[in-house]
Each structure stands twice: as C-alpha cells, then as structure tokens.
C-alpha cells in the first residue's frame, strides 16, 4: 500500500554500560508546516502508519529507558502523492560535527577559523574572534603580539551549526513537483544495504558541510569507498542522482576518489578550485543567493567547490565570477546533477523549490 510508510531504526548499544540499553522509543511527528507533537512511545524498532495524500510528514526518534531519554535522531521525511508512479529517496549524508581547522606545525599553532570554523551541534556562542597570531616564537608574549591573540569580531555572535533536519527542505522542494512519492533515510542505513536502492527512480544525497578532517573525532568522508561502489552500481542500473554539498569534490583526494568524480558524477576538479565569492549563483533561469555568511538561523557555506564538467557533461550553474557551480549529465545510461554548494543553503524557499523542479525535470524527463 503506497499510502503507508514504515519507520525503522536500530538502537545504539553502549558497550560500556549494560543498564543504558533502550527499553522503548519515542516517535515524534510533524505534518505540513506544524511543529512536532509530544511523541508516541513504542516498544519495537519499527512503526507503520498511514499517510494523508499531499501532506509532508517529518519524524525523529529518541531512545528511552529508566534513566531518561536520548538525544534525538536526525529528522526524516515522507510524502505520499496518489498520482505518482515513481519514488524519490532523500538521503541525509550531512552528519559532521567538528571543531575549527587546526594549525600545528614547526612554526605555527592555533585555530584557523577563516579556513574552517567547524560545525557545532545546533547554535553556538563559542567564538570570540579570529586568531591573529599563530607564530610559536611569540609564545609567552602578552598582548596583541602573543601567540593565540584574537580579535573580537565574533563576540556575542550566535552561529548556527548542523540541525540534522535538511531532509525537510529537500522533501518540501521535491513535493512541489506533485509527481513523486518521497521517502528518506540516513546515509548509514542507505549505504549499509538496509534498503534496496534500485527501487528508487532518483536519489537526492545531502552532503552539506560533510568532509573528512584530521582533527575530527569521527570519519566524515563525503563519499566513503562503500558509498562510491554502491552509487556506481545504482547508476549502472539506470538510477538518477542529485548530489549537493560544499566539499563534494575537494574532499575527494585519492586516485580512486577522483575516478569516482569523473566516471560517476562527470566532474573534473582541481585542488585550487574553492570559491569564496559564492553569495550569488545563476542557472536554470534562476538567480539564487546563498547563506555564505554566519548567522543564527541556518548554517553557512562560506567556501564552496568549483566543479567543471567532463566532456560528456555540461556546466549547469555558475557563481558570480562565472566559475562553474553545478555539473549536469544526461546520458542514455543514467542522469546526474551535482552542485558544488549545499542546496539547502539557498536562502529563498521559492527559488529552492523552482531549482529542484528544474533539476528533476532535467533528470527524469526521457531523453529525446
């Protein structure tokens, strides 16, 4: 029954404390533009429910036991379109939480917030300003010449980080096409063979600010080797791909990484191709503005990737300096559309929705 959706999840075991295991789960739900309800407590790790047509449903889950309630999962979304013959899978691959870029070499030491301010869990007030002095030779010096001295440009400034709810914006945008059923998944579930990807006409992969850094506590690679292999197999079966993120190409450094970019996403990338003049983007008949500045409502992408098409693909969008911000490929085998910026960082909702409709039309309309 296409009007029913099944939520399923796995508890995270704490091997250091046996009494911390979950005994039940709270399922929180929001419909349309309303807020989340107070949750429904269930004992199992799956939940089936009926969807009203043309209404977006958003969900998150917490684990419960006698000690209380866990942090929430990411938000996942679903949408039932009665006339739809195809289903689109939205995959959240933006899981990164990280401190800022670290400099630590023979001569310099510190946190380089201009290079990368990091990603907080939700909002943070954690920064006073940008470090000005990095030289280790200034260690022990007091005042503006001392190692670690910073300005006060970020004092009192609230900066939004990762809110783990970007499937909501992507599902909203896809739903405005009124053509597709929409389901969603975490990247861990999608690429651990927890679901059959070949069932889906198109995968929309959210990568946000995902990237691997030496100072992260976890591995946040944009495309892990498993993901690369599975997405290659998916496209070989004729599946369409939408990918967006600030580091979709720059996080791909090895030879096999670059082969994946060229062979699957049809992207050529040079390590120097990072764009900071990225506040405005044009393409598909649209002028778009990005959150490329720190603010308290949405995470920012101050640096994004310049991605060039291979000979079989096209440049579909451009930054203000005429460099390529998106690459599109429409072959007889499969189609894909890759943005070197996070789709959800487009400020205007109507522009976001129009862009998504244009991308879907390009990818899923049969080639003449």
Residue ranges and their predicted role:
Residues 13-38:
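Extracellular low-complexity, O-glycosylation-prone stalks/linkers
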Residues 72-200, 206, 361-368:
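Aromatic-Pro/Gly-enriched surface loop or interdomain linker
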Residues 209-304, 308-313:
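A glycine-rich, often tryptophan-bearing local segment used as a flexible ligand/cofactor-contacting loop or short
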Residues 236-244, 285, 292-368:
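A glycine-centered loop/beta-turn motif at secondary-structure junctions
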Residues 1-20, 53, 67-86:
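Pro/Thr/Ser/Gly-rich low-complexity, intrinsically disordered linker/stalk tracts
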Residues 94-98, 187-190, 208-213, 241, ...:
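Solvent-exposed loop/turn segments at secondary-structure junctions
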Residues 48-69:
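Beta-strand-rich modules
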Residues 42-47:
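Short S/T/G- and acidic-enriched coil/turn segments that sit immediately N-terminal to beta-strands
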């Amino acid at each position: 029954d296409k009007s029913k959706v099944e939520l399923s999840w796995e508890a995270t075991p704490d091997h250091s404390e046996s009494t911390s295991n979950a005994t039940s789960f709270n399922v929180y739900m929001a419909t349309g533009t309303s807020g989340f309800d107070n949750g429904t407590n269930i004992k199992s790790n799956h939940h089936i429910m009926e969807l009203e047509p043309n209404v977006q449903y958003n969900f998150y889950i917490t684990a419960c036991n006698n000690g209380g309630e866990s942090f929430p999962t990411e938000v996942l979304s679903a949408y039932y379109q009665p006339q739809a013959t195809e289903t689109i899978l939205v995959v959240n691959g933006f899981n990164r939480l990280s401190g800022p870029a670290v400099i630590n070499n023979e001569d310099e030491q510190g946190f380089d917030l201009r290079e990368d301010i990091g990603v907080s869990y939700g909002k943070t007030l954690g920064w006073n300003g940008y470090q000005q002095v990095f030289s280790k030779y200034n260690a022990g010096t007091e005042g503006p010449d001392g190692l670690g001295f910073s300005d006060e440009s970020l004092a009192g400034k609230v900066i939004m980080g990762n809110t783990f709810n970007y499937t909501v914006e992507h599902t909203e945008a896809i739903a405005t096409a009124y053509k597709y059923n929409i389901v969603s998944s975490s990247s861990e579930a999608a690429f651990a063979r927890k679901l059959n990807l070949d069932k889906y006409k198109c995968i929309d992969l959210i990568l946000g600010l995902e990237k691997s850094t030496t100072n992260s506590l976890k591995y946040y690679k944009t495309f892990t080797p498993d993901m690369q292999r599975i997405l290659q197999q998916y496209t070989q079966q004729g599946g369409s791909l939408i990918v967006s993120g600030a580091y979709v190409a720059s996080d791909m450094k090895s030879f096999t990484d670059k082969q994946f970019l060229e062979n699957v996403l049809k992207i050529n990338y040079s390590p120097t191709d990072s764009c900071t003049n990225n506040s405005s983007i044009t393409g598909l008949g649209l002028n778009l503005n990005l959150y490329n500045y720190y603010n308290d409502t949405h995470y920012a992408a101050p640096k994004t990737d310049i991605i060039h098409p291979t000979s079989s693909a096209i440049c579909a969008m451009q930054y203000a300096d005429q460099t390529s911000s998106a690459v599109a490929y429409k072959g007889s085998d499969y189609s894909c559309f890759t943005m070197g910026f996070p789709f959800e960082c487009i400020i205007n909702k109507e522009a976001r929705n129009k862009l998504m409709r244009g991308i879907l039309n390009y990818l899923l309309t049969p080639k003449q």
